[in-house]
Amino acid sequence: MKMNYPIEYYKEKMKFLRDNSERYILPITCLCLTSVVITSCLFAALFVAVRDCKRDSFLEDTTTAITTSSSIATTYRDNLVIHCPRDWISHNGICLLSTGEKVGFRQGIQKCEKLGSDMIGKSEEEMKALKNIWTGNDHSRFWVDNRAAASTFDPVNECAYGTRSSVSEVPKVLTSPCSVRRYLVCKKTDNSYPTTQSSFYNQYE
């Protein structure tokens, strides 16, 4: 059975609903705005994280590429066989010339200088090519290329030379009077034109 309410009842009902709806409008609005702000912050943080990840990945790839290129360049340099003048022999990035004659220390320096080169100095690679040839150190603790001598000897009237009896033997640095004549080897560097590998050791086996 349908009930008929007086008009005042409906007016009170509408007033109640209007008053209560106004009470919740502000909290609901604040909640919506807060949700929008939080969502925006999350998206911003996600964007920054992805960007940093891509940047770090790019930097890592770039660093790896640079390191690899540097390693390749170093390997190529260390194994470089260069173009040398006629009668000179390429050996690990330097040109070597064995004159086949025995000379004193000072005479050896002069002969190499006339050829636009230096007398072979003391280094691990260069020592591998030595058998009984002058390497420097005239009255001082410095080699002919001005590097400090690491050996413990203190020559007064002697000069240093490299010697070994075979290719497999570790080269030794000894001293003898500078006037003693020994085989001379000059060196120069010219990395302009790579060429084919050749062996320096065979001359002294």
From Swiss-Prot:
Cystines in this chain: none
InterPro entries: C-type_lectin-like/link_sf, CTDL_fold
GO molecular function: carbohydrate binding
Source taxon at top rank: Viruses
Entry keywords, A to Z: Lectin
Occurrences of domain C-type lectin (ranges): 84-187
Gene3D superfamilies assigned: Mannose-Binding Protein A, subunit A (3.10.100.10)
Name of the featured protein: Putative C-type lectin protein FPV001/FPV260
